[in-house]
């Protein structure tokens, strides 16, 4: 199994979306890439975490590239700190990885998205922390 962490607005909708994709084995909501180790819904504005979905997938059934293309279908990659009616830094977009080898795949998909849109995207690309 492999995993990737995706932030894209309210995590409940994103989690439901990815839970229905063949090859995705498990999804879990949580918070990522804040200033401290842990947070909760009441503290999130102070800790600067993003609402995030952990996506565990079988790379024999679906590629990271395919997961990212699904991701870009449901987010607005040009919006800063908001998705739809959800506003605030906790609703920012981001792709957070554990495996350094994934960074190259993610960066390639980001470059393709920027070329298609003709703009730099506002999606964070960072290793997972906190």
Positions of predicted regions on the chain:
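Flexible coil/turn and secondary-structure edge motifs
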Residues: 1-130
């Amino acid at each position: 199994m492999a995993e990737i962490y995706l932030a894209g607005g309210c995590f409940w909708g994103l989690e439901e979306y990815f839970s229905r994709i063949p090859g995705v084995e498990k999804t879990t909501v949580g918070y990522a890439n804040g200033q401290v180790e842990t947070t909760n819904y009441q503290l999130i504005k102070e800790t600067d975490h993003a609402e995030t979905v952990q996506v565990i997938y079988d790379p024999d059934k679906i590629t990271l590239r395919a997961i990212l293309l699904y991701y870009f279908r449901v987010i607005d990659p040009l919006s800063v700190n908001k998705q739809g009616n959800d506003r605030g830094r906790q609703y920012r977009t981001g792709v957070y990885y554990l495996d350094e080898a994934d960074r190259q795949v993610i960066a390639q998909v980001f470059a393709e998205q920027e070329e298609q849109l003709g703009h730099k995207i506002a999606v964070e690309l960072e290793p997972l922390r906190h």
